[in-house]
């Protein structure tokens, strides 16, 4: 067992590191001993690189771990023997703590065998390896690692009391001038071995850290090299693409040049063909001129005859087309010219527009466009109220006259295409009425009239048809002069349109009743009230809902289509003659 411990490099390193820690922490160390250890540390740094030392330490550590696993069983017994011997040694050293002694004398006594201590106290130390073996192992470890491991608190504070380590150097080299007391020796335990194995990972960890840093630097260098290669590869590909693009551009330039040459060649060929054709034509003309005889005359006469036949056929077709166009134009002309009733309607609608745009100007409604509209329609209808009332009076007279139906068949001037009797005047009036309705000028005028009324209760008796002759009193408002005039204007309007509806057979069931109603309203009372205004508004709404104006327009259009055209009558007269 002792032979295995003496041959183990781990045990020698343990003693060398323990001596270094004792040297760093004990105040009794002599300068000579420090000089000796300094010489050993300087010898360990002889031209060895850090990588070689780290590799050697790693190999020795692997050997130590292998031997440790092999000697676990034997070391337990040795530790028990060491504990027993150290107990005896501590008992024998206690009297010598206060006695002056020197390390040199102790070393000499131990070397000569005349030590007063029992032999069993230093028996394990005599089996330790030689100082040269410890020195050789210390040379393999860098001085910076030894100093760092020796200076750590974890190494120096493994036990509460420092354990004396015998000097590994020969006694003749140790010289101590001042005597120092030997510190008490506590029984060492297995912590001494643990302290060694705790120190080994610190060296190994630094070596591993250096290895990691070196491997990281190598990895980073490899990555940079790969990136550099990738960039070079991309650059090479870009250069290849550029070369290919230049080659393509040159090819395209060549193709364009060849196409230009081909186009120029084709143009030259076409010009040559044209020149050849012209020469042929000239030759044919010369040949025709040279020919003489009757054949040419016969051919020319036949061609002329065929041409004349073709011209006659085309002339007949053109004549038919002209007749159809004339017929369509006559029909269009008849439809574009307004009848007398339609002309009266156009005039009355102009009066309506002139009146309400004048009221809009008077009351400040649509002030931006009202003056221009009032000026335009006033030129076409200077007296709107008088014209509407006169038209209503004529309608009243015609409704009483049974022969008034012949009025719609009055003569029509077909030459009046550019005057007031064409359909454009009707279209302009309809557009003006739609503009008036969209701007709600009529509603604004009615609202202003309602705001200007004076409240006056008028006892107005209204007979109730459902009350069997009973009468009831309803409050009514007296209207102003402007509003009374407006009500009279609307009553005349309703009278005129219902009179025309009666004449043309539009809404036969109610037309007669409405005509008599508005005739009685317009001539039956001397004073107009708010009830009359409401009745007039209801009458206008009824007129719009039933579409009386649209029905009258369609009836007049049907009458125009039924009238015979002047050209047809002329054809009949020619046929009779």
From Swiss-Prot:
* Composition-biased stretches (Low complexity): 101-116
Question: Keywords in UniProt for this one?
Answer: Cell cycle, Cell division, Cell membrane, Coiled coil, Cytoplasmic vesicle, Growth regulation, Membrane, Phosphoprotein
Q: Kindly list the biological process annotations in GO that this record carries.
A: cytokinesis by cell plate formation; multidimensional cell growth
Q: Where in the cell is it found?
A: Cell membrane; Cytoplasmic vesicle, Clathrin-coated vesicle
Q: In which tissues is it expressed?
A: Expressed in the mature region of the primary root, tips of short, young lateral roots, guard cells in the epidermis of cotyledons and rosette leaves, the socket cells surrounding the base of trichomes and hydathodes of fully expanded rosette leaves.
Regions of biased composition (Polar residues) lie at 15-28
Q: Which residues carry this modification: Phosphoserine?
A: 130
Could you list the residue ranges forming a coiled coil in this record? Answer: 206-337
> What the protein does?
Involved in growth and development through its role in cytokinesis and polarized cell expansion. Required for plasma membrane internalization. May function in clathrin-mediated membrane trafficking, including plasma membrane endocytosis, essential to both cytokinesis and cell expansion.
Supply the name of the protein: Coiled-coil domain-containing protein SCD2
Q: Which gene encodes it?
A: SCD2
């Amino acid at each position: 067992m002792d032979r295995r411990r003496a041959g183990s490099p781990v045990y020698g390193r343990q003693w060398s590191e323990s001596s270094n820690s004792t040297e760093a922490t004990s105040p009794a160390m002599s300068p000579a001993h420090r000089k000796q250890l300094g010489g050993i540390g300087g010898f360990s740094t002889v031209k060895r690189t850090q990588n070689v030392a780290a590799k050697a330490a790693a190999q020795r550590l692997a050997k130590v771990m292998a031997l440790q696993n092999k000697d676990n069983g034997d070391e337990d017994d040795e530790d028990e023997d060491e504990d027993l011997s150290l107990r005896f040694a501590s008992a024998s050293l206690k009297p010598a703590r206060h006695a002056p002694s020197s390390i040199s004398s102790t070393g000499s006594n131990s070397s000569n065998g005349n030590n007063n201590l029992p032999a069993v106290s230093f028996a394990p130390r005599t089996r330790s390896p030689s100082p040269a073996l410890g020195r050789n192992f210390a040379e393999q470890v860098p001085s910076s690692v030894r100093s760092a491991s020796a200076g750590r608190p974890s190494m120096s504070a493994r036990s509460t009391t420092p354990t004396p380590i015998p000097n590994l150097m020969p006694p003749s080299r140790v010289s101590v001038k001042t005597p120092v007391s030997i510190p008490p020796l506590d029984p060492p335990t297995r912590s001494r071995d643990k302290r060694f194995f705790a120190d080994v990972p610190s060296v190994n960890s630094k070596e591993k850290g250096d290895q990691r840093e070196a491997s990281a630097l190598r990895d980073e260098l490899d990555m940079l090299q790969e990136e550099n290669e990738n960039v070079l590869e991309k650059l090479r590909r870009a250069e290849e693409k550029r070369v290919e693009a230049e080659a393509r551009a040159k090819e395209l330039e060549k193709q364009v040049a060849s196409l230009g040459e081909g186009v120029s060649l084709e143009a030259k060929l076409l010009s040559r063909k044209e020149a050849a054709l012209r020469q042929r034509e000239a030759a044919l003309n010369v040949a025709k001129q040279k020919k003489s005889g009757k054949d040419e005359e016969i051919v020319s006469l036949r061609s002329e005859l065929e041409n004349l036949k073709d011209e006659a056929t085309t002339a007949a077709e053109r004549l038919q087309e002209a007749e159809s166009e004339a017929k369509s134009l006559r029909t269009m002309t008849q439809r574009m010219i307004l009848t007398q009733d339609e002309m009266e309607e156009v005039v009355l609608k102009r009066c309506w527009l002139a009146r309400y745009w004048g009221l809009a100007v008077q009351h400040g409604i649509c002030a931006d466009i009202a003056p221009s509209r009032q000026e335009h329609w006033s030129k076409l209808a200077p007296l709107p109220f008088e014209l509407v009332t006169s038209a209503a009076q004529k309608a009243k007279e015609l409704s009483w006259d049974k022969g008034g139906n012949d009025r719609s068949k009055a003569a029509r001037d077909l030459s009046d295409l550019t005057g007031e009797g064409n359909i454009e005047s009707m279209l302009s009036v309809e557009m003006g009425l739609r503009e008036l309705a969209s701007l709600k000028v009529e509603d604004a005028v009615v609202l202003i009239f309602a705001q200007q009324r004076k409240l006056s209760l008028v006892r107005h008796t209204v007979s109730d048809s459902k009350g069997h002759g009973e009468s009831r009193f309803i409050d009514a408002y007296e209207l102003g002069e402007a509003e009374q005039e407006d009500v009279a204007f609307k009553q005349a309007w309703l009278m005129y349109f219902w009179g025309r509806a009666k004449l043309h057979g539009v809404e036969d069931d109610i037309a007669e009743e409405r005509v008599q109603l508005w005739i009685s309203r317009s001539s039956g009372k001397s004073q107009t009230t708010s009830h009359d205004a409401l009745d007039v508004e209801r009458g206008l709404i009824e007129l719009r809902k039933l579409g009386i104006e649209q029905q009258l327009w369609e009836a007049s259009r049907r009458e125009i289509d039924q009238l015979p055209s002047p050209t047809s009558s002329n054809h009949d007269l020619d046929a009779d003659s």
